[in-house]
Amino acid sequence: MIRIGAHMPIGGGFKRVPKETYEIGGNAFQIFPHNPRQWKANLPKEEDIKLFKEGIKKYKIDPEAMLCHSGYLINIASPNIETWNKSLELLILEMKICSTLGIKYLNIHPGSHLKSGVENGINQILKALNTAMEKEKNTFILLENVTKKGGNIGSTLEELKLIIDKAKFPDRLGITIDTCHAFDAGYDITNKEKLNEFLNKIDKYFSLEKLKFIHLNDSKNDLGSNKDRHENIGKGKIGSEGLKVFISHPLIQKIPWVLETPGDNDVHKKDIQEVLKILEVK
């Protein structure tokens, strides 16, 4: 069975997420654990947790297809000690929120080294991950591939490998592949041969077991542009034919897909329908 969904709003509480996921035709989802544009976050209220978990059972959502996405302000690669400390503190709280909700996976962007260099940035990332994962043992952290702009770390599989290889708790680390980010970073996932090379490299560096989620997005920009601008399914430079190559691969079909395309739930419902149409799923 294809597991597909979208990034869902949490306004009004986490309790709304399972039902709204079902209403857009999904059986997987991603959420923010708090307002992503604020440093402040709170643990969910007991009633919200209870109703959320009841909804998960009612709508038969696979626990392996539920994902939290870290807030925008976190930068655990930062050379600025104040920013790094605040990022670490919020990351630990996000892991607690995930655990409270019964969500196993937290997706994070590795962060930007802010001109301090990749090596220094990776060292900062490792310090943060090791500390956070020592304190919170129930949450798996997934490193998302990103585009190279702004000193971002993780635009290549090699950089993600460096982090996981040196981490203290590699068994609780995995990766998320964002199709827009991969395409914009120069990985041609629209070509069968190149896609196989990409997946073989993932298997060689991490094992495919580490690939836990796909962020399924089209791209507004060309291959290798390093822009990171998501587009709705079939309307971008990856396009319907390119996405068909990617999502038709049997290995990709084993992994949950979450859309982060522009628009609200109604738009995401149409995007999910478009994905299934591309796959020729009735």
Swiss-Prot record:
<dbReference type="GO" id="GO:0008833">
    <property type="term" value="F:deoxyribonuclease IV (phage-T4-induced) activity"/>
</dbReference>
<comment type="function">
    <text>Endonuclease IV plays a role in DNA repair. It cleaves phosphodiester bonds at apurinic or apyrimidinic (AP) sites, generating a 3'-hydroxyl group and a 5'-terminal sugar phosphate.</text>
</comment>
<keyword id="KW-0479">Metal-binding</keyword>
<dbReference type="GO" id="GO:0008081">
    <property type="term" value="F:phosphoric diester hydrolase activity"/>
</dbReference>
<dbReference type="GO" id="GO:0003677">
    <property type="term" value="F:DNA binding"/>
</dbReference>
<keyword id="KW-0378">Hydrolase</keyword>
<feature type="binding site">
    <location>
        <position position="144"/>
    </location>
    <ligand>
        <name>Zn(2+) 2</name>
    </ligand>
</feature>
<dbReference type="InterPro" id="IPR013022">
    <property type="entry name" value="Xyl_isomerase-like_TIM-brl"/>
</dbReference>
<protein>
    <recommendedName>
        <fullName>Probable endonuclease 4</fullName>
        <ecNumber>3.1.21.2</ecNumber>
    </recommendedName>
</protein>
<dbReference type="InterPro" id="IPR018246">
    <property type="entry name" value="AP_endonuc_F2_Zn_BS"/>
</dbReference>
<keyword id="KW-0540">Nuclease</keyword>
<keyword id="KW-0862">Zinc</keyword>
<feature type="binding site">
    <location>
        <position position="181"/>
    </location>
    <ligand>
        <name>Zn(2+) 3</name>
    </ligand>
</feature>
<dbReference type="GO" id="GO:0003906">
    <property type="term" value="F:DNA-(apurinic or apyrimidinic site) endonuclease activity"/>
</dbReference>
<feature type="binding site">
    <location>
        <position position="215"/>
    </location>
    <ligand>
        <name>Zn(2+) 2</name>
    </ligand>
</feature>
<feature type="binding site">
    <location>
        <position position="178"/>
    </location>
    <ligand>
        <name>Zn(2+) 2</name>
    </ligand>
</feature>
<dbReference type="InterPro" id="IPR001719">
    <property type="entry name" value="AP_endonuc_2"/>
</dbReference>
<feature type="binding site">
    <location>
        <position position="228"/>
    </location>
    <ligand>
        <name>Zn(2+) 3</name>
    </ligand>
</feature>
<comment type="similarity">
    <text>Belongs to the AP endonuclease 2 family.</text>
</comment>
<keyword id="KW-0234">DNA repair</keyword>
<feature type="binding site">
    <location>
        <position position="109"/>
    </location>
    <ligand>
        <name>Zn(2+) 1</name>
    </ligand>
</feature>
<dbReference type="GO" id="GO:0008270">
    <property type="term" value="F:zinc ion binding"/>
</dbReference>
<dbReference type="Pfam" id="PF01261">
    <property type="entry name" value="AP_endonuc_2"/>
</dbReference>
<keyword id="KW-0255">Endonuclease</keyword>
<feature type="binding site">
    <location>
        <position position="69"/>
    </location>
    <ligand>
        <name>Zn(2+) 1</name>
    </ligand>
</feature>
<keyword id="KW-0227">DNA damage</keyword>
<feature type="binding site">
    <location>
        <position position="230"/>
    </location>
    <ligand>
        <name>Zn(2+) 3</name>
    </ligand>
</feature>
<dbReference type="InterPro" id="IPR036237">
    <property type="entry name" value="Xyl_isomerase-like_sf"/>
</dbReference>
<feature type="binding site">
    <location>
        <position position="144"/>
    </location>
    <ligand>
        <name>Zn(2+) 1</name>
    </ligand>
</feature>
<dbReference type="GO" id="GO:0006284">
    <property type="term" value="P:base-excision repair"/>
</dbReference>
<feature type="binding site">
    <location>
        <position position="260"/>
    </location>
    <ligand>
        <name>Zn(2+) 2</name>
    </ligand>
</feature>
